[in-house]
Amino acid sequence: MNIKTRTKKILQKAMDEPITKEEALYLMGVTGRDLQALMIAADMVREAEAGDRITYIENWNINFTNICSGQCGFCAFKRDAADGDSYYLETERILEIAAEAIEKGARELCIQGGLYPGLDTYFYEDLIRAIKSEFPDVHLHSFSPMEVYYGAQNAELTVEEALKILKRAGLGSMPGTAAEILDDDVRAVICPTKLSTGEWVEVIETAHRVGIPTTCTMMYGHIDGPEHRVEHMDILRRIQEKTGGFTEFVPLPFMHPHAPIYREGLAMPGATGADDLKVYAISRLMFRGLIENIQASWVKLGFKFAQVALLSGANDIGGTLGEENISKSAGASHGVRTEPEEIIRVVRDIGRIPARRDTLYREIEDV
């Protein structure tokens, strides 16, 4: 394959060890055959690290309120309490949705919501206990670092105290959302009222320290550049070296159509397909030996492009989901619910082995 000498040298090295930040930034700029070579190299590392299984989980998202005091410029989900289409689900209704989800096969509930005024750690604790008392076997993968931080502030608790309360109540793991781009200059534009980079890292490292594993995410394609993406992934890499608490990395392409910062002319219209493939491939090469699982979210990418991402370093396709109002509000057009049979079909179509998993990737069963 006719590729640049530097590209070839980096990719050959990547077969044996993680690439550096400088090498990752260089690879963010490759095109043509060099991009194809990057994708192939990442797929080879994926095979060495994670094998030929493509995993998925039967889960259900419950976004319990869209009322939020935050001011995130990428979010089209947020409403004020006075808005006609605002909503807040009472615990009884959440339990009804949980029962329906579990009846349909969900083994994980991912519960997140807006920063409803006054909600605190004790609210989240009571909600966890209510669900676990009714459904003791379901795994609760719930509450973003921002919700944890906000709830702790409102309860006048430290982050560590709050997390210990939630763990005792039955919280199994946390989504590593609210990361967006871990650069405070970028955050000042896209999410000025959200926790800072340092505060996000504090919540995540504390969660890992008290025994709550998390995922990690990166939302890109708005006002960020390649250097922000590489630095973000390097921050995640350093956390994982320290704690080992990340279960997977989930790239989240910016959904621009209804996002305020796009409508105001401040943001790009999302990442390109080449951008997406570079993120999947480079993350695989950066996280070598540290984060085994990289998710290609079909809700964000659609099944067709998710297949390409799965040939470029990713090894997980996400969940069946049930409902996912946040992406839908922002303009995602690929649906919010799928059946396992559809996931199995698209995985087999690329010559891989579909496998059903649990949240923490501890129980994996070929299907």
From Swiss-Prot:
Cross-referenced Pfam families: CofH_C (PF19288), Radical_SAM (PF04055)
Keywords: 4Fe-4S, Iron, Iron-sulfur, Metal-binding, S-adenosyl-L-methionine, Transferase
Involved pathway(s): Cofactor biosynthesis; coenzyme F0 biosynthesis
Cofactors demanded by this protein: [4Fe-4S] cluster
Gene Ontology molecular function, alphabetical: 4 iron, 4 sulfur cluster binding; 5-amino-6-(D-ribitylamino)uracil--L-tyrosine 4-hydroxyphenyl transferase activity; 7,8-didemethyl-8-hydroxy-5-deazariboflavin synthase activity; iron ion binding
Radical SAM core domain span: 54-288
Catalyzed reactions: 5-amino-6-(D-ribitylamino)uracil + L-tyrosine + S-adenosyl-L-methionine = 5-amino-5-(4-hydroxybenzyl)-6-(D-ribitylimino)-5,6-dihydrouracil + 2-iminoacetate + 5'-deoxyadenosine + L-methionine + H(+)
Record's keyword annotation contains Protein biosynthesis: no
InterPro entries for this protein: Aldolase_TIM, CofH/MnqC-like_C, CofH_family, Elp3/MiaA/NifB-like_rSAM, F420, FO_synthase_su2, rSAM
SUPFAM superfamilies: Radical SAM enzymes (SSF102114)
Signal sequence segment: none
Binding-site positions, [4Fe-4S] cluster: C68, C72, C75
Biological role stated in the UniProt entry: Catalyzes the radical-mediated synthesis of 5-amino-5-(4-hydroxybenzyl)-6-(D-ribitylimino)-5,6-dihydrouracil from 5-amino-6-(D-ribitylamino)uracil and L-tyrosine.
Assembly description: Consists of two subunits, CofG and CofH.
Family indicated by similarity: Belongs to the radical SAM superfamily. CofH family.
NCBIfam families on file: CofH family radical SAM protein (TIGR00423), F420_cofH (TIGR03551), PRK07360.1 (NF005609)
PANTHER family linked to this entry: FO SYNTHASE (COFH), LIPOYL SYNTHASE 2
Protein name per its UniProtKB record: 5-amino-6-(D-ribitylamino)uracil--L-tyrosine 4-hydroxyphenyl transferase
Taxonomic lineage from the root: Archaea, Methanobacteriati, Methanobacteriota, Methanomada group, Methanobacteria
